[in-house]
């Protein structure tokens, strides 16, 4: 009876996790609509999408029945994530403009596929129980997942340095926090350290981002309002479209101008 209830809770949490993860995967869609309209990737980087693709590939391998049984929901969302990231990277490949950039993307993709394929072959041929395979693939998956959640550290550092939230979208921070939280719960029903630990780390990073948002929200509004007045920006400027108006490396300089330093 208890086992059936735990399975039901796990399934409900997993479905919720799939929905939130889907929202997270689709969150860059406006960026790629902008790229298609402009027919240029401008200064956007493919690295976040390459990193997410690698994480999804390893997660999909981890969730296979012959590696970690009863993880259908994990395989499902990982497969969806792989598809979405491939679409994004294809758009990036088409509009990146320089052949050198295309070669770099192709090389990184090749290395990722070869790495995951090699890992799969080694695990499935050299290890003969699902427990052994779970540990081997789980450790690799745990590392990549934790690295993905730690990727906003540079943005968080910029927020603290500039006292501006312009490059840390609130909605993305909230969805990331919820995603990590739901998959942490999923990793505890029953306990799976390779899901619970990295997603627990993700919860911490997500919470820190929300704390930063609460800390610097007022100062960001003041900075943007002053900047609009001083630099002659026209129209209503919101947090969501500041990216289109200011390059990250110029924020400290602009903030000094606004402050009159």
Curated annotation (Swiss-Prot):
Its main location: membrane. InterPro entries: SWEET, SWEET_rpt. Pfam families: MtN3_slv (PF03083). GO terms for molecular function: sugar transmembrane transporter activity. The keyword Repeat applies. Residues 1-11, 68-74, 124-134, 190-193 are extracellular. Residues 33-46, 96-102, 156-168, 215-261 are cytoplasmic. It comes from the Eukaryota. It is a multi-pass membrane protein. Residues 12-99, 137-221 form the MtN3/slv domain. It is found in: Cell membrane. Keywords: Cell membrane, Membrane, Repeat, Sugar transport, Transmembrane, Transmembrane helix, Transport. Disulfide bonds: none annotated. GO terms for biological process: protein homooligomerization. The chain crosses the membrane at residues 12-32, 47-67, 75-95, 103-123, 135-155, 169-189, 194-214. GO terms for cellular component: plasma membrane. Belongs to the SWEET sugar transporter family. Mediates both low-affinity uptake and efflux of sugar across the plasma membrane. Forms homooligomers and heterooligomers with SWEET5, SWEET8, SWEET11, SWEET13, SWEET15 and SWEET17. This is Bidirectional sugar transporter SWEET6. The gene is SWEET6.
């Amino acid at each position: 009876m208890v086992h059936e209830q735990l399975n039901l809770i796990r399934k409900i949490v997993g479905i919720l996790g799939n929905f939130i993860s889907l929202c997270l995967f689709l969150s860059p869609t406006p960026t790629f609509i902008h790229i298609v309209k402009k027919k240029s990737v401008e200064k956007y980087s493919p690295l976040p999408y390459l990193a997410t693709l690698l994480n999804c590939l390893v997660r999909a391998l981890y969730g296979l029945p012959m590696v970690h049984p009863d993880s259908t929901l994990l395989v499902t969302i990982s497969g969806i994530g792989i598809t979405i990231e491939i679409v994004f990277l294809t758009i990036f490949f088409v509009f990146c403009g320089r052949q050198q950039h295309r070669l770099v993307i192709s090389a990184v993709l090749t290395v990722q596929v070869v790495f995951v394929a090699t890992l799969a072959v080694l695990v499935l041929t050299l290890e003969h129980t699902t427990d052994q395979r779970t540990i081997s693939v789980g450790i690799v998956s745990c590392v990549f997942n934790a690295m993905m959640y730690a990727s906003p550290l540079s943005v968080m550092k910029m927020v603290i340095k500039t006292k501006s939230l312009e490059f840390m979208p609130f909605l993305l921070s909230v969805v990331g926090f919820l995603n990590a939280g739901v998959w942490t719960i999923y990793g505890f029903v029953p306990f799976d350290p390779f899901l619970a630990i990295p997603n627990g780390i993700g919860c911490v990073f997500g919470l820190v981002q929300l704390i930063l948002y609460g800390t610097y929200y007022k100062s960001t509004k003041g900075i943007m309002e002053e900047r609009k007045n001083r630099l002659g920006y026209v129209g209503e400027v919101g947090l969501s479209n500041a990216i289109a108006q200011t390059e990250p490396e110029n924020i400290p300089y602009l903030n000094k101008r606004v402050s009159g330093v």
